[in-house]
Structures are given as structure tokens and as C-alpha cells.
Curated annotation (Swiss-Prot):
Expressed in adult brain, heart, kidney, liver, lung, skeletal muscle and testis. Expressed in male germ cells, present in round spermatids of steps 1 to 4. Component of the NuA4 histone acetyltransferase (HAT) complex, a multiprotein complex involved in transcriptional activation of select genes principally by acetylation of nucleosomal histones H4 and H2A. The NuA4 complex plays a direct role in repair of DNA double-strand breaks (DSBs) by promoting homologous recombination (HR). The NuA4 complex is also required for spermatid development by promoting acetylation of histones: histone acetylation is required for histone replacement during the transition from round to elongating spermatids. InterPro entries: Enhancer_polycomb, Enhancer_polycomb-like_N, Enhancer_polycomb_C. It comes from Mus musculus (Mouse). Keywords: Activator, Chromatin regulator, Cytoplasm, Differentiation, Growth regulation, Isopeptide bond, Nucleus, Phosphoprotein, Spermatogenesis, Transcription, Transcription regulation, Ubl conjugation. This is Enhancer of polycomb homolog 1. Residues 346-361, 564-577 have a biased composition (Low complexity).
Amino acid sequence: MSKLSFRARALDASKPLPVFRCEDLPDLHEYASINRAVPQMPTGMEKEEESEHHLQRAISAQQVYGEKRDNMVIPVPEAESNIAYYESIYPGEFRMPKQLIHIQPFSLDAEQPDYDLDSEDEVFVNKLKKKMDICPLQFEEMIDRLEKGSGQQPVSLQEAKLLLKEDDELIREVYEYWIKKRKTCRGSSLIPLVKQEKRDGSSTNDPYVAFRRRTEKMQTRKNRKNDEASYEKMLKLRRDLSRAVTILEMIKRREKSKRELLHLTLEIMEKRYNLGDYSGEIMSEVMAQRQPVKPTYAIPIIPITNSSQFKHQDATDSKEFKVNKQDKADLIRPKRKYEKKPKVLPPSAAAPQQQSPAALPGFSAKDLNQYDFPSSDEEPLSQVLSGSSEAEEENDPDGPFAFRRKAGCQYYAPHLDQTGNWPWTSPKDGGLGDVRYRYCLTTLTVPQRCLGFARRRVGRGGRVVLDRAHSDYDSMFHHLDLDMLSSPQPSPVNQFANTSEPNTSDRSSSKDLSQILVDIKSCRWRHFRPRTPSLPDSDSGELSSRKLHRSISRAGAAQPGAHTCSTSTQNRSSSGSAHCAFTAEQYQQHQQQLALMQQQQLAQTQQQQQANSSSSAAAQQGFVSKTLDSASAQFAASALMTSEQLLGFKVKDDVVLGLGVNGVLPASGVYKGLHLSSTTPTALVHTSPSTAGSTLLQPSNITQTSGSHSSLSHQVTAASSATTQVLFGNNIRLTVPSSVPTVNSVTPINARHIPRTLSAVPPSALKLAAAANCQVSKVPSSSSVDSVPRENHESEKPALNNIADNTVAMEVT
């Protein structure tokens, strides 16, 4: 890195001088390292100061000792002390003054002169005292007047006599002394003055000049940039002002025509009064003989419905053109086109004027067509007929996609008294009422939270979208505790009879147990099960469980009189073992256990209702939930199919049930009657709104991931479990969370998934289902009734043999 070097530059007085603080200054050795191998640079001092011995000694010491800090010499002027001389001038006695800062009082005293006596002046004054009466202050005043009265050239003696009001002899002596001293002085004045800038500009580079004048810079005018935007604004302003002037002219002509019409009406009445035509017969004869005069301007045949998209045809039938007024004529006013924005403009509609064509002798169509404007307040459709202003078009958030009417197109207004015929609306509102569009209570697993009522649909690109619906229980659903789903609590889900509408705020009376049992028996309750993609057959045990499940499903479809049930085994090798049937003794023990469980759950429900009566009274009125343990469900299924039937089916390849994150599956759903599936989808609690007015749909994209497959012979871990759920009809679902790898599947009766009646069901199975439905489950206020899998760290046990050890509740919601 090269060292810094300096070169002599011309001093610039306009350049500001830098001001350094003590901490900003570099060290002395950094200064010494700077190379000054340049010609003789002026030091900024006078030649006499440069030749002083203390400065020369400092420079020579630096050359001798080098750049060592210890040998540096700070140039300090020498001071001499003469105590005798000091004592002769100043008195020895010193008294502390009352104040250290003296301020001269405002009085009529003369100002003190700026000139100070020196030793030579003092010698001259002492010599002059012998001849004349003069004091040092008087001498200073005289010299001060002479210095201030003279500029570059000293004043003459005659001018000095005019300045000084003293004796001529004294003036002459002082003047001669002043002229002699002024000539010997190097400066222009004897009074030390601050050196100022000369007007001729010669002192620009003089470093001793202080208080320089400001550089007079010409203030240039900042011209406004005339760009295209400002030019367009001026054009718009001119257009608006011209339109206002034209409107005022039209109003003036309209009022003038009205006044003429009034005068003509008065003349007609006077003529009729003079003729005695009180009955109007003469007037009618004259009107009959009068030939209809064709209007000067053509009347456009444009229906009014074309001009407004907010008015229905029925509402505008009464606003047609009035034919009985013959004096009115319609004028064509096409909208003015601007070349900068070529747009497809609608055909200009006509606005009826209040004056006859004969009353407009000096009115030209050019003046009328120059600007688009409403002619009168008597025309309610004039604002609609006229096109939108450019400001509104520019501020339109849709931009180029904004709606614009096209010529020749007729737009019908929407029927506000009717709702849309959407598939999810009820048939009474004109919809299809399809069960595929039901709203269900939805719970996400990642992150684990309850969303409220939602429904799944496939969007663009196969993405699954959740449409959310508003309900009165949203505040409660959002704070549900998902870890307390096993505790029984009344559920408000049964309050909704229909679940095909997006608004679930309207509640109906809850169904009693008998009605629910009737619906179950008649299979009017349907179950929505989403299709899942087939997983790679990497495990032989997994493949065997799939084959067993498919064989059971086909057998159930082939026999219309009975349901099928798939049983679980303890390990993979025993997937094809025989089904264990219940004996009479086991059935009696099972009934006693069910009764004891029912009593315990009823007691817990009463305690929970008393504790939460103040906070969730409204939510507990219709919140009913029924439970059924897995063993009872398996027993009810075994009553419909023998153990020999479970082992006699052939194994074939088919689609099996899988798992999914948040219940997001790639394809649409399959509808089967009374189907048990071991899945972990999002909660689908089917609810029903009765009105579609206050609908709040919030679609949200759900990430689709492939879940793990839960099969008959697949061994689950402690962190993952399966949830078995049964959906009956529109708003009932049986959920069986289980820790054992069991798939309880009651398959549909045929391939078309048509619900059938339970005509061939034994009475014992129906009694068992009725007894199980009497149990009430507990659902806490901070949790949702859903099908989210709950972690169960229990060991795998047989589902049918060990009923008391591993009894899991099945929720009927």
C-alpha cells in the first residue's frame, strides 16, 4: 500500500473545513509515516514565523532523532518575566471586585475608542503634554476618528480639521504624527481589524480573510415535469369543466322550454275558455284532426333491461317509454371515445328530453354528443344508461377483468327471492340435497385441533379442499380437548337432522333412542368412506390381511340376508384361524358388564353436567352420545355370520383401507351402508342446518399425504392406534378406538352399496344393539367428537376372549 502524499493545491474558500474531535485524530506515528516527498509546501505561516528559532529547533530535532515520540519537541514560544516592570505598571494592592463581569450601563457616555495606545504613542503624548493640554483618552479618540474617516487613502489636513473638533495646532501635531506612523505601518490601518474579502475577488485565495460573503448562486426555477400522466389529468380537468358548462347550458335551455310550454298551455286554456269548451269536445276534435309529427331525431329501439344488470325484467316493465306524450323525443348520445384507451363501449342509450323538437332551433347534436351527462333529475335511469367514468374504471380492482356490457347482449338480473340450486342445498330450496356434500365435525391430526364443521371436496389438480361452515358451537369446538375424547359427555351433534347445508346454526329437536334404533334397523343411516390408494404389498402378513378382508367383503355382497364381520387375530401367522363364537354363559357375563358400565357412565355424566351447567348449558341441551364397546359390536356382527363363513371365502386382490393424514384422500368417497372401517381420517360428524342464509364457507387447502396401512395382521406400535367408526344415515357415527390391530368390518350387502333392511337380523342382536345404545358417552367441552386416532399403549390382546380386559367404547354420535 502506497503512502499518502500531498501536493500543493489552490485554497478553496467555499470548501468547508473539517472539524475533528480529539478521539478522531490519528496518532503521532501515523502522521510521521505519511510521505511528504513533495516540493516546498507553504506552512500557512508568515515568513517571520517560519524563521523563528523554536520552530526551526523542532524541525531540526525531528530530523536528528527521527520519528521517536520521546524526542519530539513541542514548539512553545519563550516567555520572559520582568517583575519590576510589572509592579511599576500595576498597583500592588488588589481588591476583589463586586462582580467579575462588567456591563456598561446604558447612558449618554461616549463610546470607548477602538484604538489603543502603544509605547510610541505614550512617548509622543507625554512630550505633547508639555506644550498642549491633551490626555491619552483624547489622543485615542482623535486617532480613532482619523482611522475610521479614511479608507485606503488617508484624509487630508482640511478633512481632518472637519473630523476633529479641537484646536488647529493640536490637530496639526496629531495629524503629522498619524501620517508618519501610518506610512511606516505595513497594514492599511493602525486599528487591528478582521481581514475581510475584497469585492474585486482578489482575496479569494487569501487564507487570512474572515467572514467571506456567501456565494451568490442563481436560484433556478424548478419546472414541473410535463409527463403523460399530468397531461392526461389536465385533459380530464378540461373535460369535467366543459361538461359542467354544457350541463348548465342544457339546464338553462330546459327551463326556458318549460316556461314556453307553460305560456302555451295558458294560451290554450284561454282559447278554450273563450270558446266555452268546458267539456273538452272541441279539444278532442282538434287533436284527432292533428297529424302526428315525426320527431327530428330517431328514437332508438333498445329495451331498458340492457342498461342495468341490477333490475329484473318484471321490475322494469312499468318503466317503458311513455307514448302518450307526443312532445318528447329521444336523442342518441354515443359515448365519447378516447384514443389513449380504446375500449368496447356499450351502445349509448337514449334519454327523453322535456322539450319538443320545435323548441330547439339553435340546439345542435354536436353540442349534445360532446359529453356524456344526465339531462334531468326526472330521468331515474339516466345515471344507469350513461357509461362509467374513467376514474371508476381506473380504480376498479378487477382492472382489465372488470365486467363490461357488450352490445347486443341482454343481461338478466339474479332472482333474489330464490336460492341457488346447488347440490348441497336441501330439496325444499331447489337443491339436490346430496349426502356427499354433508358437513361433518372435522379434526386435524397435524396440527391436532378441531376446525368445526367442514366437508371435503376435490379441487384443481386433485387437491382436497375443506369447505368450512359456521355454526353456533364454533367457539366450543375450537377449544375442545382432543385427549379427553374417551370421557362421556352429552354431544350436541344429534340436534342436527340434516347435514347437507352449509349453515348449521338452526337446531332441531334431538331424536330419541327409539327413533335412532328404528333408523339403524331400517339402514336409513348411511356411511361415507373415502377411497384410499393401494399401498405397496411389501409385507406378506399385510397381504394376507388384505385378502381376508376382500373375501369377507365379497361374501357380504353375495348374501343379501346377512352382514359379514372380519375378526382380529393375535399375530400374523394366525390370521386364518377359526372364529371364536360366544356361549350362553359368556353372553350373560357380557350383559352384566354392559349394565355395570352403563351405570358408571350415567353417574359420570350427571357429575359432569352439574359441574358444567353454568358454562355450557346451551351446548348440553341436545348433546347426546351413545357408546358401544368393541366386543359387543363384534358379537352383534357374529350374530349375522357364522364362523364357518369367515373361513370359506376365497382370497382375491382388491383395494384395501389405508390411513391418511388429516383424513385427506385423493379420490372421492364411496357410500356404503353400515360399514366399519379401521382408519384415521379427519372427524366427520354429520350435522344439518335448516337454513342457508347465514352461510360461511372458508375453503382451505389440506396437504395430502399417504398414511400407514392398518390391516388385520399388522402389528401396531405404542404411538399409533386405529379408530373404528360406523356412520349410520346422515348424522350418526359409531367410533371404536382400539389398541389392538383389529379391523371390524361389516361389509355392504351388494356391489352397488344399496342399503337394505335388517329383516334377517336375529332378535338377540337387535336387543344387544338396543342395550348398547342406552349408554351415554362423555365428550368434554374442550374436545371434539371425531375419528382422530388416540394413542393406546396397551398390549395386544384377543378381542373376543378377553372382553373384560380390553373393552373399548364405541361412540354413536
